[in-house]
């Protein structure tokens, strides 16, 4: 009934210009209510001044990257952005991977091993996620702000969050279906088939999946997102046939999110239908400033209701 997409600021672009571009793509075309997380990639004095205007236009959530040279912010910028968003009572979600470490590991792999999709998981170790989470939480603590860890994928990263929470730090956590259901064996599919599962953070080990499910049941995960970023195999993923680093990172998930969590979480006895509603509706609405207009069945709330048939069978297909 409602989605929050990402609008990404290009280098040299103002936040307002970026938001306008994405509104033009969605206005009159979206089949449901929508809003935007603002991805800040070019932080400067003008961007800082625009934060109040973003609030006026309904933006309550921001996205930052600690990886990707064309997207990432440095530690100083991270501190400044966290502080600026806190003044507007917004929340910052962060892609936590140490981009420099990933780049160094990748260069070493390319010099020593034959190109293969199987190098993708080797190039993005769990340590790179855990280190970035630890650094982010240190910066957030110094800034005196809460922070949202998006698409948490690893047991190591989860342990960093658990430690910070024990020390009293306010940390929100999102994970995604791919990290609860799939694991790194998908990269061992024959030929180039594993490219379909190239994403970042990458799919982890079975023990990481189990740790995340345990965190879901212990109320240590606040939201189930998707990090939806769909690509065709032919013409897009195949760009990386001769160089695994050129495989576009991303998989879809928005449409399948409820059915996947219901099947692998509720039906298989890992969690409850009430927990599913919390992760998919209640918690996101509260964190992103939409509650009680969204995320609740209350007088005056939007009548955004999903009628769920637990007996319906689904087949996920590209056809």
Annotated model-derived regions:
Residues 190-191, 240-244, 315-319:
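Short, surface-exposed loop/helix-turn segments at secondary-structure junctions
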């Amino acid at each position: 009934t409602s989605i929050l997409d990402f609008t990404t600021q290009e280098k040299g672009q103002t936040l307002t210009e970026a938001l306008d571009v994405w509104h033009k793509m969605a206005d009159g075309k979206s089949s449901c209510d929508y809003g935007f997380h603002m991805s800040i990639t070019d932080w400067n004095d003008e961007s800082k001044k625009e934060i109040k205007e973003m609030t006026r236009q309904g933006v309550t959530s921001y996205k930052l990257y600690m990886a990707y040279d064309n997207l990432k912010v440095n530690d100083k910028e991270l501190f400044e952005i966290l502080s600026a968003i806190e003044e507007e009572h917004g929340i910052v979600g962060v892609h936590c991977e140490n981009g420099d470490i990933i780049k160094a590991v990748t260069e070493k792999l390319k010099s020593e091993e034959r190109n293969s999709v199987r190098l993708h998981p080797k190039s993005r170790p769990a340590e790179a996620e855990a280190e970035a989470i630890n650094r982010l939480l240190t910066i957030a603590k110094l800034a005196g702000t809460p922070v949202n860890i998006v698409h948490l994928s690893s047991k190591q990263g989860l342990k960093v969050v658990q430690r910070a929470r024990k020390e009293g730090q306010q940390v929100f956590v999102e994970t995604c279906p791919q990290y609860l259901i799939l694991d790194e064996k998908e990269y061992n599919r024959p030929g180039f088939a594993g490219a379909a599962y190239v994403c970042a953070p990458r799919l982890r080990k079975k023990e990481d999946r189990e740790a995340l499910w345990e965190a879901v049941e212990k109320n240590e995960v606040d939201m189930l997102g998707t990090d939806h970023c769909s690509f065709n195999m032919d013409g897009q993923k195949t760009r990386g046939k001769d160089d695994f680093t050129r495989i576009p990172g991303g998989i879809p998930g928005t449409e399948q999110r409820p059915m996947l969590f219901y099947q692998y979480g509720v039906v298989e006895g890992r969690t409850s239908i009430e927990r599913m509603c919390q992760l998919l509706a209640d918690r996101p609405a509260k964190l992103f400033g939409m509650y009680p207009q969204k995320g609740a069945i209350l007088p005056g709330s939007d009548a955004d209701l999903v009628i769920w048939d637990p007996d319906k069978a689904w087949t996920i297909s590209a056809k």
